Amino acid sequence: MRRSMASNGHILTASSVVGASSAFQNPCLAKVEVQPNLPQRTVLGVIGDNEQRRRSVSRGGVPAKSLPGIENVLAFPGKILSANPAPVAPKPSFTVYVDEPTETYSVEIDCPSLGDEDSNIVKQNIHLLLDISEASPMVVDTSPQTSPEDDSVTDPDAVAVSEYIHEIHQYLREAELKHRPKAYYMRKQPDITSAMRTILVDWLVEVGEEYKLHTETLYLAMNYLDRFLSCMSVLRGKLQLVGTAAILLASKYEEIYPPDVDEFVYITDDTYSKKQLLRMEHVLLKVLAFDLTVPTVNQFLLQYLQRHAVSVKMEHLAMYMAELTLLEVEPFLKYVPSLTAAAAYCLANYALNKVFWPDTLEAFTGYALSDIAPCLSDLHQFCLGAPYQAQQAIREKYKTTKYMQVSLLEMPSILPLN
């Protein structure tokens, strides 16, 4: 089923995955044009209150858009915005460079001769063609991998570098404090809500499953998104554009074979042009100051699971619980990733083994159970309500046999933390 979003946060469904229109623009279910000869894709409508524009879904040619790309992204003012802010003309806090024609530069490089007879320096003029156009800034090699993807043949010690595990953990603990989004940034957003962000995360999970992206890619994308929204005000009509640019950037960082830019344009039902997406990627990088290497909940959880070996089922259950924390800004953004990962480990361990936090991990992390208890309680309550959430992409993901159907396990109703 194709899923679309309305401005009130409800999920709208249609009969096809392809051609989802901008349901955020209209609370009613938007019309869908189906391209019968194309493979099915997961698409998401755009968040917005304005009248949605009629658009063609034809892949043959996308009509040019007149939107500048970032006109709905504003810098936060110095004070908290009121509930009904007065209309203010958008003022971008940075300069977006307009695409220029291809230019040719001549660079002189001094190359010494390799022969003994000719010791003179040879000057070569190398012409570099710098294509400053709308084309993708990178070329993706889509050839299949030659080696089979078998995690069982990977030596964990070779990957984790066990000799330096304490130094690595200490470095990640220090780095997580430097790249944290603001815990309550959503309260300062004038036009978007936590419910809209939740719907966006749900869609990004489906995108990750559609293109078989790594779990770490999703966590990185959410870090980029939350850090961007912590200091920039975004109108609902551009929220999906920022989210798409975030997962595009995370894919380039994490994946060996990331999807092409055109694929990300396609999954938005061509709501945004390729030029808009690349410009938003540029804006995202400037706001993040190119700080893309950040610790995530996933990284800490993998450390814990490797440090204190558990069953495969518990690994999947802990990963499921940790991924659920991506759905909500409050209360989980107020906890550092290492603490959230510890809470996911404790809850999964108690659900299956009736124990919380092993002594080995307490010594390794310095976290006592009393330190983890507040985050653990919040995560427990959220997991109890997960089956009744409108957004079910994460639960559906972990319902599969690949993850041993851990999302179907019944959570304990009470945790003996006192």
Curated annotation (Swiss-Prot):
One of its GO terms (biological process) is cell division. Its main location: nucleus. PROSITE patterns: CYCLINS (PS00292). InterPro entries: Cyclin, Cyclin-A_N, Cyclin-like_dom, Cyclin-like_sf, Cyclin_C-dom, Cyclin_N, Cyclins_cyclin-box. Keywords: Cell cycle, Cell division, Cyclin, Mitosis, Nucleus. GO terms for cellular component: cyclin A2-CDK2 complex; cytoplasm; microtubule organizing center; nucleus. GO terms for molecular function: cyclin-dependent protein serine/threonine kinase regulator activity. Signal peptide: none annotated. It is found in: Nucleus. May be involved in the control of the cell cycle at the G1/S (start) and G2/M (mitosis) transitions. Interacts with the CDK1 and the CDK2 protein kinases to form a serine/threonine kinase holoenzyme complex. The cyclin subunit imparts substrate specificity to the complex. Belongs to the cyclin family. Cyclin AB subfamily. PANTHER family: CYCLINS. This is Cyclin-A1. It comes from Xenopus laevis. The gene is ccna1.
